[in-house]
Amino acid sequence: MAKTATKVRKKIKKNVAEGIAHVHASFNNTIITITDRQGNALSWATSGGAGFKGSRKSTPFAAQVAAEAAGKVAQECGVKNLEVRIKGPGPGRESAVRALNALGMKISSITDITPIPHNGCRPPKKRRI
């Protein structure tokens, strides 16, 4: 029995001028997602996906490489202006923003949206090394 040919859909190129860069910097990894104003993802990258494994994922350089990767794909979609929202205490916070700025994107605002508990859940115990 002959197989039916699957249709290959051409990816629709979005043309968005303004976007939001969500930087989630944890202690172990950094995730950068660039969305349009409505929250639809245009591009994303992680430190682990950029080729870093283990403890090197949590370095500022790994966050910089991931931000450059996400930023280049977003520039292909036409993004020129960015609003940056940073979440988390990780070491890749600053370097991810600097990498996006170095790509030539105009950053209109930087907002820290790290969730802070008002005495909610008990935090993890302190590490003993």
From Swiss-Prot:
Cysteine disulfide links: none
Gene Ontology MF terms: rRNA binding; structural constituent of ribosome
UniProt cross-references to Pfam families, sorted A to Z: Ribosomal_S11 (PF00411)
Keywords: Ribonucleoprotein, Ribosomal protein, RNA-binding, rRNA-binding
Single Gene Ontology BP annotation: translation
GO cellular component: ribonucleoprotein complex; ribosome
Domain of life of the native organism: Bacteria
PROSITE patterns linked: RIBOSOMAL_S11
InterPro entries in UniProt: Ribosomal_uS11, Ribosomal_uS11_bac-type, Ribosomal_uS11_CS, Ribosomal_uS11_sf
Protein family per UniProt: Belongs to the universal ribosomal protein uS11 family.
NCBIfam families hit by this protein: PRK05309.1, uS11_bact
Role summary: Located on the platform of the 30S subunit, it bridges several disparate RNA helices of the 16S rRNA. Forms part of the Shine-Dalgarno cleft in the 70S ribosome.
UniProt subunit comment: Part of the 30S ribosomal subunit. Interacts with proteins S7 and S18. Binds to IF-3.
Record protein name field: Small ribosomal subunit protein uS11
Organism: Azoarcus sp. (strain BH72)
